[in-house]
Amino acid sequence: MEIIVSKEIAKVCPEFVGACVEAKVVNSAYNGGLWDEIHAFGERIRTELTTETLKNISGIAAIRRVYRASGKDPSRYRPASEALIRRLLQGKTLYQINTLVDLINLASMAYGYSIGGFDADKIVGERLTLGIGKAGEPYEGIGRGQLNIEGLPVYRDEIGGVGTPTSDHERTKITDKTTHLLVLINGYDGDEKRVKANAGYILDLLKKYAGSDGGTFFVYK
């Protein structure tokens, strides 16, 4: 898979760095070991952060700046990483979806980056381009219906949008039948070392909980 970062993104975030993780996997409805890790993370994070200080996490602060620069209110269209951590800090439980989605959510919270997870076999073409959503652009967010993505960073394949930091698209979503996983880590803070560490963490989780073939990743800018 080739990933292109458009001039639109370079204009609002010249320091952007991303990582693309790809792996053959075996998904499951639930994994107890993974949820033990998620619960332990939740207990720790509640002692370290508040709903205000979480905005200072570098990846979250950076994507909020990009939203504002693109004309989007980050408090109305929260980046997924922020929304997930906020939910834990408010004493709520996370939604349990399936092992791959739950695993990606943990990785997103652990590093503060918005991470897109996709069934790679549902992506049309061999290239994804990261740009900015346009007025009236159709986009069906997972569990959200039609989402107004004007001003949001968006990955597009040959057909249209597949992922934003707020919500991925129904068309390319991960299901229990997914065997070919594509994960995109979005480092709007420009911290390449941290983005690479996040990719390595995901590869480790995939081997532990999703029968991964080992997987690979590459960095793109």
Give the role of each language-model region:
Residues M1-K221:
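Charge-biased, low-complexity intrinsically disordered regions
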